[in-house]
């Protein structure tokens, strides 16, 4: 076993002495050593309770005959980091998380890992680490937050964090008072857990379950339910079974598993950020991933779940309706899933889902009666985005699926947000936000503030926004991100000028700057990149080494 390097033999007496300094007994040191990553902190609602999950995981490892060794990890709350310099660091933290888990697992010769995570960049960071290290590993999430209840509406319809973001726009446009918004902010996030809709964190937790790196229930069991604690114990027991059978991530994270993940991604209407994270995870797993796969799979996988921000239902409803296993079961009935893929249970995807069924056909619709005939995401190509750009088509109102309008050009999110809040954006406009890509931002900030204000002002049915930055999983409307190549790398989005007509056709998967190619080339011939916004520290190094969003924004 790997841990023999720190436990067994005469030469390892100093190593054992150090373990004994922490209270480990000889009996514990004669068992497999399992690393437990616990990124608990008191800054993220989705991570504030992870000590409870970690305690349960450790109990599960002990129950199955292993010895847990817990270590910490960082985590950024995207909501708190939103709309200021902190958001530059969110995506970049994904690589730090992956690197730090690799360091801890390798330095201490763990035989297996249980990686606890829950929020936006922590989940993909942990998955990237699992693929890279390739020792028996189980991912266990902390679970979703429950939805809040609207304090300003009779019978209290469900609300979540995005309701509050959109409330800012409603106040700006006079549709809501500040007092009403204050009441809403008190009620929108009533428990710990990852934010309640199908935003990035829950998207990735659900896809972790589909890929096979998380146990059934991982994606949807709410944070505050006792069954989440039981699942954490089972995760600890499962990793011991994997160690015994030598089941590793490379056996689980196969091309077929990623195809399954994309299929369920389309059925659920997941965050556009999955189009960043799945390629990055696949890169670590040595699996080829092309953005065109999204359109190919979306064309044959219908959209079955209308979850917030694209609909009324929340993750707690999806859990009640049968969860991810019920979605898989429905897709399996129509031969849309590879059922042979192995999972952390030691069983196949098909075996895990064999007893699942849809318990609420309005939350999880059948393939015959979907919300939309195509899946949740689409990748658009054209002269403004030769390498592609991404939109959550399931959250776009029908009239905006095909749109053309004048470009309103901004070289930062801050400029765009101010213009929107000042009422300078009109119906029909196409807001262009550039120099916010992985290199240009740097860090590819989420544009939740401008898109939420647009929605809160009631303009989401009339205004589009395109950017080389990205969007929160909570974004809705004609919000088109990940434009590649980005402006900082000389992508043609840098050539767009105020008033240029931009044509968007989501059904046809096209986006075009209505300017002759000769003119675009002439504009770019006179273009020079702006000075870097950050010249020292981690983000300066990140900007120099990060790849295009079309490649998952991985750091080489």
UniProtKB/Swiss-Prot annotation:
Note describing how the cofactor binds: Binds 1 [2Fe-2S] cluster per subunit. This cluster acts as a Lewis acid cofactor.
Pathway(s) this gene product operates in, as recorded in its UniProt entry: Amino-acid biosynthesis; L-isoleucine biosynthesis; L-isoleucine from 2-oxobutanoate: step 3/4; Amino-acid biosynthesis; L-valine biosynthesis; L-valine from pyruvate: step 3/4
Catalytic activity: (2R)-2,3-dihydroxy-3-methylbutanoate = 3-methyl-2-oxobutanoate + H2O; (2R,3R)-2,3-dihydroxy-3-methylpentanoate = (S)-3-methyl-2-oxopentanoate + H2O
Residues at the active site: 472 (proton acceptor)
Keyword Amino-acid biosynthesis included in the entry's annotation: yes
A Pfam family of this chain: ILV_EDD_C
GO annotation, biological process: isoleucine biosynthetic process; L-valine biosynthetic process
Subunit structure: Homodimer.
Official protein name in the record: Dihydroxy-acid dehydratase
Lineage: Bacteria, Pseudomonadati, Thermodesulfobacteriota, Desulfobacteria, Desulfobacterales
């Amino acid at each position: 076993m790997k841990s023999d390097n720190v436990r067994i033999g005469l030469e390892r007496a100093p190593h054992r002495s150090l373990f004994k300094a922490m209270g480990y007994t000889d009996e514990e040191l004669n068992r497999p050593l399992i690393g437990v990553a616990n990124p608990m902190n008191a800054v993220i609602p989705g991570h504030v309770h992870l000590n409870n999950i970690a305690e349960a995981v450790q109990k599960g490892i002990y129950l199955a005959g292993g010895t847990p060794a817990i270590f910490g990890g960082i985590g950024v709350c995207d909501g708190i980091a939103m709309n200021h310099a902190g958001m530059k660091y969110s995506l970049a933290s994904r690589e730090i998380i992956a690197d730090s888990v690799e360091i801890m697992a390798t330095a201490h010769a763990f035989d297996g890992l249980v990686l606890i995570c829950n929020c936006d960049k922590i989940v993909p960071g942990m998955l990237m680490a699992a693929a890279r290290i390739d020792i028996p590993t189980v991912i266990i999430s902390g679970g979703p937050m429950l939805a809040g209840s609207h304090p300003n509406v009779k019978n209290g319809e469900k609300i979540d964090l995005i309701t509050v973001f959109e409330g800012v726009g409603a106040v700006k446009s006079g549709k809501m008072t500040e007092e009403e918004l204050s009441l809403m902010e008190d009620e929108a996030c009533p428990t710990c857990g990852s934010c309640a809709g199908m935003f990035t964190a829950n998207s990735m937790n659900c896809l972790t379950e589909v890929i096979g790196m998380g146990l059934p229930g991982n994606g949807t069991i709410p944070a505050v339910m006792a069954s989440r604690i039981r699942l954490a114990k089972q995760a600890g027991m499962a990793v011991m079974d994997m160690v015994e059978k030598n089941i590793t991530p490379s056996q689980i994270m196969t091309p077929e598993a990623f195809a399954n993940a994309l299929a369920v991604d389309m059925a659920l209407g997941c965050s556009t950020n999955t189009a960043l994270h799945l390629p990055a995870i696949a890169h670590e797993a040595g699996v080829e991933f092309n953005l065109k796969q999204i359109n190919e799979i979306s064309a044959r996988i219908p959209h079955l779940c209308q979850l917030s921000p694209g609909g009324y239902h929340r993750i707690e409803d999806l859990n009640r309706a049968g969860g991810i296993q019920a979605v898989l079961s429905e897709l399996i009935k129509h031969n849309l899933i590879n059922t042979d893929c192995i999972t952390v249970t030691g069983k196949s995807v098909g075996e895990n889902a064999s007893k699942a069924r849809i318990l609420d056909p309005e939350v999880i619709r059948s393939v015959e009666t979907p919300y939309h005939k195509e899946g949740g995401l689409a990748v658009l190509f054209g002269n403004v985005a030769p390498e592609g750009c991404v939109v959550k088509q399931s959250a776009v109102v029908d009239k905006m699926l095909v749109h053309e309008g004048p470009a309103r050009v901004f070289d930062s999110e801050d400029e765009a947000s101010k213009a929107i809040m000042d009422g300078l954006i009109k119906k029909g406009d196409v807001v262009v936000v550039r120099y916010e890509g992985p290199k240009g931002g740097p860090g590819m900030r989420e544009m939740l503030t401008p898109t939420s204000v647009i929605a809160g002002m009631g303009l989401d049915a009339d205004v589009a926004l395109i950017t080389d930055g990205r969007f929160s999983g909570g974004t809705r409307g004609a919000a088109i991100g990940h434009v590649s190549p980005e402006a900082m790398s000389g992508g043609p989005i840098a050539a767009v000028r105020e008033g240029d007509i931009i044509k968007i056709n989501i059904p046809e998967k096209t986006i075009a700057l209505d300017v002759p190619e000769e003119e675009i080339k002439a504009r770019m011939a006179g273009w020079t990149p702006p000075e870097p916004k950050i010249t020292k520290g981690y983000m300066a190094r990140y900007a120099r080494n990060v790849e295009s969003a079309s490649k998952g924004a991985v750091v080489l």
